[in-house]
């Protein structure tokens, strides 16, 4: 999947000359026909002639909705490739948008081969990087790809945002969120690697990725990886504290590993620790988060939390839901009843797809950002109140009208 680039002149052939004339000269007709093609096919036909290339550009600009590719237990297998790599390779043929930014998450047990015995760290690292590279190669070269691996995955099956989301606490699974280039919205990946010799964060580092001096900043998804390493959790809190006092939505948690970040030139070190994420900027963005604390322990209290999120009145169209839960929640936490929180979300948000993970710590609080209205300003929330365990963070991100 590559960008529109080649061009030529439409030439006649043995087909009906009237059809040739229409498809060579009437842009309105060509555009109408091309709207039915997926992005990969559009990029191929863009090489037919200059007229078609310009029509392809216009058609792609109208495809602004976020798309997702998901792989759950039904797609899992014992084949050599992780199910997410296999499903992405198949489904990208039918995707209608040109991905500009991709966020993918996969289960750590199968993605990085944690079943390898001790003494085979080098083999495990190679397997992880090979899987990540295979996934990255499927996307356009100019696409920004951020990938993380976690103990468990929350995913909405493909086909419709109203499909029942699945909490997959154990097992091969994953998803890829595909963001097109959306007018008026900027999505930037960021990465801060913990360096024991230099723990200072320079202001320009934060400014370059949209985390400081950015009046349009609305949402930050932030993930600490390899936080079991000495000092890693403190470093995560240090990074978050630099922008947590702003009126933005902040959501995320601690994951096992960072597996992909194509915007960086140097290869990733699977043994390193640091902080990674995405910043979302643009006045059209609306967002809200709620915290499900330890008091939320049954269906009734979970639904009450979703009612608080629903009260934010975030539009459902072109909106994504995120669920960042502790590995200590889920099936066992709800007395052997599975999918409680995902089902509660679906009850109050019937058409919003939900994605996320079961991780090792959660970041966020109750907050709403819609235009100039802030439910709870960040400077009223202490840093300690943003970091949790045995909780779940539910978030909504609305990216404006898709029209």
Curated annotation (Swiss-Prot):
Pfam family, one: FIST_C
Chief subcellular location: cytoplasm
Record keyword Cytoplasm present: yes
Sites of N6-acetyllysine modification: 194
Keywords: Acetylation, Cytoplasm, Phosphoprotein, Ubl conjugation pathway
Modification N-acetylmethionine occurs at: 1
SUPFAM superfamilies registered for this protein in UniProt: F-box domain
Location within or outside the cell: Cytoplasm, Myofibril, Sarcomere, Z line
Cellular compartments per GO CC: Z disc
Domain of life of the native organism: Eukaryota
Modification type Phosphoserine: residues: 128
GO-annotated biological processes: positive regulation of proteasomal ubiquitin-dependent protein catabolic process; protein polyubiquitination; regulation of skeletal muscle fiber development
Reported function: Substrate-recognition component of the SCF (SKP1-CUL1-F-box protein)-type E3 ubiquitin ligase complex. Promotes the proteasome-dependent degradation of key sarcomeric proteins, such as alpha-actinin (ACTN2) and filamin-C (FLNC), essential for maintenance of normal contractile function.
Quaternary organization: Directly interacts with SKP1 and CUL1.
Name of the featured protein: F-box only protein 22
């Amino acid at each position: 999947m590559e960008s529109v680039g080649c061009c030529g002149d439409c030439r006649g052939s043995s087909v009906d000359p009237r059809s040739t004339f229409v498809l060579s000269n009437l842009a309105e007709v060509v555009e109408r026909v091309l709207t039915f093609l997926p992005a990969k096919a559009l990029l191929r036909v863009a090489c037919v002639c200059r007229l078609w290339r310009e029509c392809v550009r216009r058609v792609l600009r109208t495809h602004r909705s976020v798309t997702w590719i998901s792989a759950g237990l039904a797609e899992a297998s014992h084949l050599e490739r992780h199910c997410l790599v296999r499903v992405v390779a198949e489904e990208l043929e039918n995707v209608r948008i040109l991905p500009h930014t991709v966020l993918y998450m996969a289960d750590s047990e199968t993605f990085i081969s944690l079943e390898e015995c001790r003494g085979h760290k080098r083999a495990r690292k190679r397997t992880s990087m090979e899987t990540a590279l295979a996934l990255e190669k499927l996307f356009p070269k100019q696409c920004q790809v951020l990938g993380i691996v976690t103990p468990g995955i929350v995913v909405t099956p493909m086909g419709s945002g109203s499909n029942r989301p699945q909490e997959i606490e154990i097992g091969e699974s994953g998803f890829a969120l595909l963001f097109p280039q959306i007018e008026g919205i900027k999505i930037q990946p960021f990465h801060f690697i913990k360096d024991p010799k230099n723990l200072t964060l320079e202001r320009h580092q934060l400014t370059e990725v949209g985390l400081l001096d950015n009046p349009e900043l609305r949402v930050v998804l932030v993930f600490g990886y390899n936080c079991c390493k000495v000092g890693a959790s403190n470093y995560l809190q240090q990074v978050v504290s630099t922008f947590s006092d702003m009126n933005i939505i902040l959501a995320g948690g601690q994951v096992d590993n960072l597996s992909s970040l194509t915007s960086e030139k140097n290869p990733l070190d699977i043994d390193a620790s640091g902080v990674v994420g995405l910043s979302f900027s643009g006045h059209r963005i609306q967002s809200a988060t709620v915290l499900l604390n330890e008091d939320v322990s049954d269906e009734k209290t979970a639904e009450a939390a979703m009612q608080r999120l629903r009260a934010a009145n975030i539009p459902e169209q072109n909106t994504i839901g995120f669920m960042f839960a502790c590995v200590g929640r889920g099936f066992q936490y709800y007395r052997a009843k599975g999918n409680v929180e995902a089902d509660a979300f679906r009850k109050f948000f019937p058409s919003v797809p939900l994605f996320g993970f079961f991780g090792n710590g959660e970041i966020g609080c109750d907050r709403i950002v819609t235009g100039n209205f802030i439910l709870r300003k960040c400077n009223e929330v202490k840093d300690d109140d943003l970091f949790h365990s045995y909780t779940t963070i539910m978030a909504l991100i609305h990216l404006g009208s898709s029209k």
